[in-house]
Amino acid sequence: MEIKYVKGDATSPIIVEGKKSVIVHCVNTLGAWGKGFVVPLGQKYPQSRKIYNHFIQLHKKGYYTSLLGLICIAPNVSKDIDVVNLFGQERIYPIMKDGEIIIPLDYIALRKGFETIVDSYASEYSYKPVPITVHMPRIGCGLAGGDWNKVEKEKTYYTDERF
C-alpha cells in the first residue's frame, strides 16, 4: 500500500473514483467527545458520534469488559465515506505518576484496532488491492501525547501486509 502524507482537513478526504474513503481516528473509552479532531468530525458527520455514544452505553451496561482496541464503524456517513472510531485511549490527557509522564494512548489497543480495521475491510472485498483509501490525522499524538513514529509503525505493519 502506498502511503501519501497530505496536509489538509482529514474530515474532507480526497475522493478516489471507485474507492471508499475511510476516516480513522482515535477515541477514548470515557464517553468524552469534545476536544481535538472529534469536534469538527462530529460536526460534519454526526453519525460517527452517535455510534461512539452507543458503544459507550453498551460498555456501561456490561456488554464489553473493555473497549480498548475495539472499533466502531459509522458506515456511509457521506457518499463513499466511512468513519472508524478506534478506542485507543482510556484517558484524555497525560498524567504524572511517580515523576513519570504516563500517556493515555495505548499502543497495543491501536495495534489491535488497526488489525480489526484491515480484517473488516479485507473481508468485505474478496479481491486485492482492497478498494479503500484511509485518511487520518496523527491519531493519538495530540491531546493523548503519543509518539507518531510508534503509531505509524503500528499502522504500517498492518496496512502494508494486507492492502
Can you describe what each PLM-predicted range is?
Residues M1-F163:
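Macrodomain-like recognition of ADP-ribose-binding/processing modules
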